[in-house]
Curated annotation (Swiss-Prot):
HAMAP family: ArgC_type1
Gene designation: arg-6
The organism of origin for this protein: Neurospora crassa (strain ATCC 24698 / 74-OR23-1A / CBS 708.71 / DSM 1257 / FGSC 987)
Lineage: Eukaryota, Fungi, Dikarya, Ascomycota, Pezizomycotina
Name of the protein this chain belongs to: Protein arg-6, mitochondrial
InterPro entries: AceGlu_kinase-like_sf, AcgluKinase_fam, AGPR_AS, AGPR_type-1, Asp/Glu/Uridylate_kinase, NAD(P)-bd_dom_sf, NAGK-fArgBP, NAGK/NAGSA
Residues at the active site: 689
Presence of the UniProt keyword Oxidoreductase in the record: yes
Gene Ontology BP, a term: L-arginine biosynthetic process
């Protein structure tokens, strides 16, 4: 149904630029020629260096994200890339981080214009000189003595920044005089304070064209040569008005704006949210002033310009990822609505909008007929003033749900976030809605986020939200299964266009995802945390679309004494939809369960007979077996016996190795095992900790194996359990590392079985408490580069919230307490036919308890990551 707007979407409220096609990923030198100012040999960027930096930047996001932003940023003249305002505190406390970030930008050929202040330093100098700083309405009162101190200080701070950049190989040019023309703001009130009347753009353009980053101070001069003090925020705003950059960045120690609950605000779309925000009691003081000033600035700039408030350590993430890291503020766009074609001022323009990006020789004629259809039928259209986005909804009628009949959005429409605005309006006016999307639509992940359920039929996906009646959902699914888009009849423009372009083809039913407890899921490719499609992960997370359970799940934990049991108790305690009803431990029976706060729970010593009877009565939704290897069989058989007697089917999750090789059990590694299988499962074998990290570290390269991978694994001593042994004796482990089971370890067999390829595994235990590090040597069947291999991993794990692909080799000390796996290193030998990859995992979390909870969420019908802090 939807036009192929190949874009990437920004997290939640943010949507960004078009995804870079494969042919454009190299970012050829020709990109530089598109710039509006000349470049010289001094500033030409070596593509090898550029590629290396792209790879490094990919540690904060995917390579695609980095390249798409580079493509966007280099599509404008260099001085229009970004204006970055640097506060005095940043120069004092975060100079190294700032310069490192600027070096990245410089190396990839991006030249931001930097303007800095030095307010905190000036206050200290004045106090040391016995001068008390004076402010009126937040503006510094500046007399001759203050100005003299300020001028010397600003020159000193400017030189400090320039010298630091030069030390790092970044050519920087201090532009400290003649950059801002100004008049007195109010000489009687503020003294030597300026109101900027002009900006010397030529000096900035010359510096950049000669390969230098321009570094400006916030000092201005009158036509008579009098120096005036200007607030750095004001100077940055005036620079932005003169240069009209894509980005205006305010570097801040806080890293963004925060709401009443102390949560960082990810994005503000001023056209839709400004009045509401300014009416909120918590929007006051500096926050209120900042939002007001930014609105005044953006009102004078192109709609594509945005303002980011960000910490200097996160500058790359803000600029080069969909998610960003600080607070993004943009104008957005207000929507208009029409219920009749006569309300459109220009029908020809409407036709052009409906036909754009639509293929087919008869598209124009089909659109004409569609407009005739709209003349005779009720509809409501939602669009912005520039028609960058248009949605048409046919209202609900007897026996039919409201239908989103067509939606078309341009690149500019995504850039200005109109897609989210439209769906917000739709949900306000239409309690339930049905729509269809092509399965290869690059925005499919975004549509999943907007929907409650979906069903797939050869190349098409039907989505819906707000339909509560199960019979209606079943009827809808059946209709779509039998008829596809044709079920929507003449209301669906894409269906008309398809019919006009080709004869109907026989279609077969594929998998579907619904709000049923254990639906079979379609094989879609949804990317990570910010809701955009990557089309590379064959088994993407299902997210909140899996949520169907309408009550808390009742959980029984058998064997709660160990480290894993304790971690799982903590996770369930913070889970909004799970309750621990029973915990069983022979040693702790009769004692109060500590660390669980939802209700008082007393340890029991449950027998298999107790378990059987509880299953018969249907008291438990999920049994978690946290017992040593070889112990849980009587309890599992008791659950089976209870099932036979009652028909009640709870979920069993076994944390031991007892059933990992039993094909009657589902292996619970959601990132590699089809999630639809886990959703349907009633008995799940939780993978081992070593095995999880090893499989994730090897799996993307299985088709490229040229021999047996070797895994050198080292675990903290918590992996040896609580029962005393040499492997968890800290004194024995101090200054020591203990190898064990160097051949034939159960995890060696487990990984080999799951990957379908033999591996060699050599486990060791070390003196730290938790965390595993794998060094994996993988022979390849062809020559490959480090960059290619890393991209392979990024593509395979796109969208996974518990797998993080990084550039450098990950470290154990950074994985402790985290709920996922980090994979990095990607060192290739000189032949190109062997790669060494490193992986880390917290053996008690993603290696055990977190993995268990992830499987519980899927099998019980909750959002996959509910209750799990993601990476």
């Amino acid at each position: 149904m939807y036009s192929a707007c190949a874009v990437a979407l920004r997290a939640g409220a943010r949507r960004v630029v078009r995804r870079v096609p494969k042919s454009a990923r190299a970012l050829p030198r020709a990109a530089a020629a598109r710039r509006q100012i000349s470049t010289t040999a001094a500033r030409s960027t070596d593509l090898t260096t550029r590629g290396m930096i792209v790879q490094t930047l990919s540690s904060v996001g995917s390579k695609r994200e980095v390249q798409q932003y580079l493509s966007l940023f280099t599509s404008v003249s260099s001085q229009r890339f970004a204006v970055i305002k640097v506060g005095g505190a940043i120069l004092t406390d975060y100079l190294d981080e700032l310069c490192a970030a600027l070096k990245f930008l410089y190396t990839v050929g991006l030249y931001p214009v930097i303007v800095h202040g030095a307010g905190p330093q000036l206050n200290r100098l004045l106090e040391d000189a016995g001068v008390e700083p004076q402010f009126e309405e937040g503006i510094r009162v500046t007399d001759a003595k203050t100005l003299r101190v300020a001028r010397d200080l600003f020159l000193q701070e400017n030189l400090k920044l320039v010298n630091k950049l030069e030390e790092m190989g970044v050519h920087a040019q201090p532009l400290t005089t003649g950059m801002f023309r100004a008049d007195y703001l109010n000489k009687e009130k503020w003294g030597l304070v300026g109101k900027v009347t002009g900006v010397n753009k030529q000096a900035i353009e010359t510096a950049i064209s000669n390969g230098y980053l321009p570094i400006l101070t916030s000092m201005a001069e009158t036509d008579d040569g009098q120096i005036l003090n200007v607030n750095a925020d004001v100077a940055a705003a005036e620079l932005a008005r003169a240069l009209e950059p894509l980005k205006v960045v305010y570097l801040s120690e806080k890293g963004g704006l925060f709401d009443a609950g102390g949560q960082k605000i990810s994005a503000i779309n001023l056209d839709e949210e400004y009045e509401h925000l300014m009416s909120q009691a918590w929007v006051k003081y500096g926050t209120r002033l900042k939002i007001k000033e930014i609105k005044e600035l953006l009102d004078t700039l192109p709609r594509t310009t945005s303002v980011a408030i960000i910490h200097p350590e996160e500058l790359q993430k803000e600029l080069f990822t969909d998610s960003g890291a600080g607070t993004l503020i943009r104008r957005g766009s207000k929507l208009q609505a029409s219920t009749s074609l006569s309300e459109f001022k220009d029908l020809e323009a409407l036709k052009s909008v409906l036909i754009r990006d639509r293929e087919g020789p008869d598209a124009k004629e089909t659109v004409e007929k569609y407009l005739d259809f709209l003349k005779e039928n009720p509809f409501k259209a939602y669009f912005d003033s520039s028609m960058n986005a248009l949605a048409i909804v046919l209202p609900a009628s007897e026996g039919r749900q409201a239908t989103l009949a067509t939606l078309t959005i341009t690149k500019s429409g995504w850039l200005t976030n109109i897609a989210d605005n439209i769906f917000t309006a739709l949900k306000k006016e239409h309690p339930s809605l049905v729509w269809t999307v092509k399965e290869d639509d690059e925005n499919l992940g975004w549509f999943f986020d907007k929907a409650d359920g979906s069903i797939t039929r050869q190349g098409d996906v039907m989505f819906w939200y707000g339909i509560e009646n199960g019979d209606e959902i079943v009827k809808l699914m059946k209709d779509f299964t039998e008829n596809g888009r044709a079920m929507l009849g003449n209301s669906n423009l894409e269906s008309r266009l398809r019919q006009a372009a080709s004869k109907p083809a026989a279609q077969q039913v594929r998998g579907y995802s619904t709000l049923a407890r254990r639906p079979a899921l379609p094989k879609f490719s949804i990317s990570n945390r910010r809701g955009y499609l990557t089309q590379t992960n064959p088994n993407p997370p299902v997210g909140k679309q899996n949520a169907s359970m309408d009550r808390p799940a009742r959980v029984a934990l058998i064997g709660a004494r160990g480290y894993t049991g304790q971690e799982l108790i903590r996770l369930i305690d913070s889970h909004p939809n799970m309750e621990l009803h029973h915990v069983s431990s022979r040693e702790l029976a009769g004692k109060k369960l500590e660390g669980y706060n939802k209700q008082e729970v007393i340890y029991e010593n449950l027998s298999p007979e107790d378990v059987r009877d509880m299953e018969k009565r249907g008291e438990i939704d999920c049994w978690v077996m946290a017992l040593p290897n070889g112990v849980c069989k009587p309890f599992v058989e008791a659950v089976w016996e209870g099932r036979k007697a009652s028909g009640h089917k709870s979920v069993i999750i076994d944390l031991s190795a007892d059933y990992r090789f039993d094909n009657k059990w589902t292996y619970g590694l959601p990132e590699l095992v089809q999630r639809s299988n886990i959703i349907q499962a009633t008995q799940i074998a939780n993978p081992g900790c070593y095995a999880t990290a090893a499989q994730l570290g090897i799996s993307p390269l299985v088709p490229h194996l040229g021999g047996m991978p070797h895994v050198f694994g080292v675990s903290g001593y918590s992996g040896a359990g609580t029962k005393p042994s040499p492997k968890n004796d800290v004194e024995n482990l101090t200054n020591n590392i203990i190898p064990y089971s160097l051949t034939g370890h159960i995890h060696e067999r487990e990984v080999s079985s799951q990957l379908g390829a033999e591996i060699a595994f050599m486990p060791h235990v070390a003196v730290w408490f938790r965390g595993i590090h794998h060094t994996i040597s993988i022979p390849l069947n062809k020559s490959m580069t480090s960059r290619d291999i890393r991209q392979l991993y990024q593509d395979r794990y796109a969208g996974e919230k518990l797998v993080k692909v990084v550039g450098e080799a990950p470290s154990v000390k950074n994985i402790g307490g985290k709920h996922g796996v980090e994979i990095g290193g990607f060192e290739v030998d000189k032949s190109g036919r062997r790669v060494v990859i490193c992986a880390t995992i917290d053996n008690l979390l993603k290696g055990a308890a977190t993995q268990c909870l992830q499987n519980m969420n899927l099998a019980l019908g909750y959002a996959e990551y509910e209750g799990i802090p993601t990476m």
